[in-house]
Amino acid sequence: MDSNMMPQTAQQNAVFSKTNFAQQKLGQYQVVAPASPVCSRPGSSCSQPPTLFSNGPAVLTPTGSPPPIGFRPAVMLESEFGDSSYFPSTPPLSTSGSAVGSPKNYEVLQTPLNPMFSGLDGFVGVKSGYESTESSVLDWASCDSPPMTPVFIHSQPSRVPSLSSTTSDLSNISCPSLSPSPAPYARSVSSENDVDFCDPRNLTVPNTSNSSLAPEFTLDCLGEEEGSPSEQSALDTVLSQTAFDFSPAIASGLPAFEELSDFESEDDLSNLVKPGEGSRPRACTGSSIVSLGHGSFIADEDFSFDENDTFQFPSPSPPSSVEAVDDGHKDKRQKKTGTKDSQSAEPVMDTAAADNQTAEVEEQSEQASPVPSESHSSAEADTPSAPLPAPTNRRGRKQSLTEDPSKTFVCDLCNRRFRRQEHLKRHYRSLHTQEKPFECNECGKKFSRSDNLAQHARTHASGGAIVMNIIDNADPSAYEAGMVAPPPVDDYANYGKVLFQIAADVPGSASELSSEEASDNGKKKRKRSE
């Protein structure tokens, strides 16, 4: 019988152990308590320590011995895991003892999360000027208020300001901005009977809160219907005067749309453009850009002043003054080139010069033409010639501007500058004194320049203009076949002139223009003049 009862007993024990397996495990964990609580809380919280398994049975039935291993189920399913039986249950959000917020009797807040309760409402250091103007816009009461909390606020007619109240009294009420959101305080703060639910903002509020905060936020400025219409209109008047009153003195003192008369005048704007007005001419060379002094041709305003006062000599009339030209640009170029010709260092080769250079034109026509054509060339020089634009623009690199500071020799009469003294003397004789010290021995013609005499001597086939009696040996065989011994000349003063003439014929001499260059230029201009 024992053998028959043993399987039944084992089966009953297996069934019983299967039913109470979780309870046995709970009993083992209940006896062995943890060394430290899972959620450590301050001693002043006035709450019980958390129970590890709040869902377990109150009375546990102990078992005699663990069940046999062979009768345990192969698969163990923890059916109570969803009920959080192995974890401490979530503490309830109650106002009596909560582990989430600060305790009720703890006065100092560690982290003031809400600026409404930071104690800055009655701060003395705030200036009264900023309080009166900005309290209706930037208020501590309207910072973190919930947007649509269902709060019913009782009206207090005694707190409504009248027309006689000042803006500082209005700032003490701390009216928030006129937004649809109600006051930030819930009823759980103002009343002590509401303990049935937990307000999240109550978790950070100390128990002994400031009593002056509660009446400040029971406001009547949100437009409730309980207030009388007269009091509501009086409050709206004060608010409108505080927030949106702009004095007319400030508006008139700041003329935002007044016309700016500083930019109406064109003179002020033209001063900004003046440095860029000077445009150089197209025919300008590099030497004219670098040249300094009052004769610079960089800008057009150089021609605006009187040239007689500046250069101290009468400026020759340009060729454009003789004939009217319709093209304005062409007239400007001719005027510039005519002024350049009046200041050039070599005025000898200009056939289109003015009346004060007629003597030089006569010299060129005489030395470039044979003797029978003297009357024709002098008649051409007396009559005003037609304007020739081509010779005025033909200017070599040697004929640079006369206002170069490197030219140290200055003429006393016309202020022209030259690099060498012989150039200054040649200019002085040809233009000012009309002195002609050079004379041809065959025809007796006189010249003011030695290169003109050398050019004229080539017209004679015999070459008698060159005096060759410097050598003492008068043997005709010593001369070349084309050279004939000249007759003896008693005037030895002409020897220096002859030496100067020979030196001028040498290509590398001190003269600026050699005889060949002078002859080529003379031939070209003589062809154009005819």
From Swiss-Prot:
Outcome of gene disruption: Shows remarkable defects in conidial yield (40% decrease) and virulence (25% decrease). Decreases tolerances to hyperosmolarity, oxidation, carbendazim, cell wall perturbing and high temperature at 34 degrees Celsius. Significantly reduces the resistance of conidia to oxidation, hyperosmolarity, wet-heat stress at 45 degrees Celsius and UV-B irradiation. Leads the repression of conidiation- and virulence-associated genes and affects also expression of stress-responsive effector genes and cellular signaling factors.
Zinc finger (C2H2-type): 409-432, 438-460
InterPro entries per the UniProt record, alphabetical: VerF-like, Znf_C2H2_sf, Znf_C2H2_type
TM spans (from-to): none
Subcellular location: Nucleus; Cytoplasm
Highest taxon listed in the record's lineage: Eukaryota
Single Gene Ontology MF annotation: zinc ion binding
Cellular component GO terms, alphabetical: chromatin; nucleus
Function: Transcription factor that acts as a key downstream transcription factor in the HOG1-MAPK pathway. Plays crucial roles in the regulation of conidiation, virulence and multi-stress responses. In addition to regulating the expression of genes specifically involved in stress-response, conidiation and virulence, controls also expression of cellular signaling factors.
Protein name, entry field: C2H2-type transcription factor MSN2
Species this protein is from: Metarhizium robertsii (strain ARSEF 23 / ATCC MYA-3075)
